[in-house]
């Protein structure tokens, strides 16, 4: 029995397929992610294969995260210094974005095409990966999460609001901040080529690679 088990393990290693893993910042087109419209590169016959894990209203998420902090901040402030609508304040400001998006994909249209055995394997890996994303990243409040299978290659869109609590600096004690949200997760950043965001994306790719490995896919790192 032990001999058979060792043999099987060698067979799995022998047939490990090598695939690239990509993680990138997306444009954050919520209408595209939700398929409010069908772009040219989308196959309308496969739209029903898409998986929607989360699809919340961004304004409601802002109320959930920041309304109490706005109330605390406004205490004792002159009316012209008070924050009336934090969502609009961020939307109209230049320091922070309302939300950020990250996209993850295994392989490409040549080796992990939608509808193929390999493509279905990519779907399984991405599905397993996303299940613990929020738990792993508590300061990145996910409000939109979609696994698309109606384009060339299965890929995952994750839309989130990065925030920090117990902030001691200027402004509200709970506020939008990508830099501080990632710092609280342990990513300190180094220079402009080694930012908190780059460190975090690389870490998430490693998490994805570990799950892929359990499914017989080895991360092919290029460059």
Range-by-range predicted roles:
Residues 1-223:
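N-terminal nicking endonuclease/strand-transfer module with a His-rich metal-binding environment
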């Amino acid at each position: 029995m032990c001999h058979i088990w060792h043999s099987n393990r060698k067979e799995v290693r022998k047939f490990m397929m090598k695939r690239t893993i990509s993680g990138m910042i997306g444009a954050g087109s919520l209408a595209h992610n939700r398929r409010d419209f069908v772009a040219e590169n989308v196959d309308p016959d496969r739209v029903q294969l898409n998986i929607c894990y989360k699809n919340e209203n961004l304004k409601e998420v802002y109320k959930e995260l920041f309304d109490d902090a706005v109330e605390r901040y406004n205490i004792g402030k002159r009316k012209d210094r008070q924050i009336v609508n934090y969502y609009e304040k961020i939307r109209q400001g230049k320091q922070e974005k309302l939300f950020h998006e990250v996209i993850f994909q295994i392989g490409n249209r040549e080796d992990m095409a939608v509808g193929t055995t390999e493509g279905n394997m990519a779907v399984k890996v991405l599905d397993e990966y996303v299940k613990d994303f929020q738990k792993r990243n508590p300061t990145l409040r996910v409000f939109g999460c979609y696994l698309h299978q109606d384009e060339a290659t299965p890929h995952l869109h994750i839309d989130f609001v990065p925030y920090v609590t117990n902030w001691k600096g200027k402004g509200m004690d709970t506020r939008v901040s990508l830099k501080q949200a990632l710092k609280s997760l342990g990513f300190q950043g180094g220079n402009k080529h080694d930012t908190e965001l780059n460190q975090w994306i690389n870490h998430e790719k490693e998490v994805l690679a570990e799950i892929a490995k359990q499914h017989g896919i080895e991360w092919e790192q290029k460059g």
